[in-house]
Amino acid sequence: MNDNFKKQPHHLIYEELLQQGITLGITTRGDGLSDYPKNAFNMARYIDDRPYNITQHQLQLAEEIAFDRKNWVFPIQTHENKVACITKDDIGTNIDTLTDALHGIDAMYTYDSNVLLTMCYADCVPVYFYSTKHHFIALAHAGWRGTYTEIVKEVLKHVNFDLKDLHVVIGPSTSSSYEINDDIKNKFETLPIDSANYIETRGRDRHGIDLKKANAALLNYYGVPKENIYTTAYATSEHLELFFSYRLEKGQTGRMLAFIGQQ
């Protein structure tokens, strides 16, 4: 696949940004220690897995991306649209063990160096933000709830520079095979973007939704230039050899870790 995300042993990396001091990527599912499912490279401490496995996977990833895990930050995601400002004082949060810190946070941003923002995914959309000019990075977790409540708009509220200097990467997530019902479709039709561009009716109370397209449209609507938005072709629901899919695997699966940091 011709994509800006390039395969590595346990992750995909947005390779062209490395020379700009940006480490941006997402883990893949295979060649791990977890039994959930077998040989999974699960990165979530909050599912049925041994803590030892997660720690070993963290250490493996830290070595592969050359970003010490002591500098990682992980929030407790709740499918909302709250955004947290992260500083070096937050490094290590929820990495060795889960705590009450950063609870209810589904997006983070920082202007600090040597901080790796991380969150878990298994169909929801990882949205990465960066500006090398202004030394800004952010990461958002956008499932259908986060997309509908415009979590990308909430992140943009914390950008204190011209949006023409901001770049956004929309990472691997479910494809338009993801379906919603009438009630959820009606919610999306209240957004300030044309739902016909990302929702397709397939039958009674059945509508396919492309959450990647929806988030890209919202970003553009709120001022991010189209040419500054990159959307990967990788999809969790179409590439099960690489990714976990909560919906296709009926919840019995692991989680990938999306990450972004700057040197």
UniProtKB/Swiss-Prot annotation:
Its EC number is 2.4.2.1, 3.5.4.4, 2.4.2.28. Purine nucleoside enzyme that catalyzes the phosphorolysis of adenosine and inosine nucleosides, yielding D-ribose 1-phosphate and the respective free bases, adenine and hypoxanthine. Also catalyzes the phosphorolysis of S-methyl-5'-thioadenosine into adenine and S-methyl-5-thio-alpha-D-ribose 1-phosphate. Also has adenosine deaminase activity. PANTHER family: PURINE NUCLEOSIDE PHOSPHORYLASE LACC1, UNCHARACTERIZED PROTEIN YFIH. Belongs to the purine nucleoside phosphorylase YfiH/LACC1 family. Homodimer. Zn(2+) binds at residues 79, 124, 141. Pfam families: Cu-oxidase_4. Gene3D superfamilies: CNF1/YfiH-like putative cysteine hydrolases. It catalyses: adenosine + phosphate = alpha-D-ribose 1-phosphate + adenine; S-methyl-5'-thioadenosine + phosphate = 5-(methylsulfanyl)-alpha-D-ribose 1-phosphate + adenine; inosine + phosphate = alpha-D-ribose 1-phosphate + hypoxanthine; adenosine + H2O + H(+) = inosine + NH4(+). GO terms for molecular function: adenosine deaminase activity; copper ion binding; oxidoreductase activity; S-methyl-5-thioadenosine phosphorylase activity. The keyword Thylakoid does not apply. This is Purine nucleoside phosphorylase SAS1121. Its cofactor is Cu(2+); Zn(2+). Keywords: Copper, Hydrolase, Metal-binding, Oxidoreductase, Transferase, Zinc.
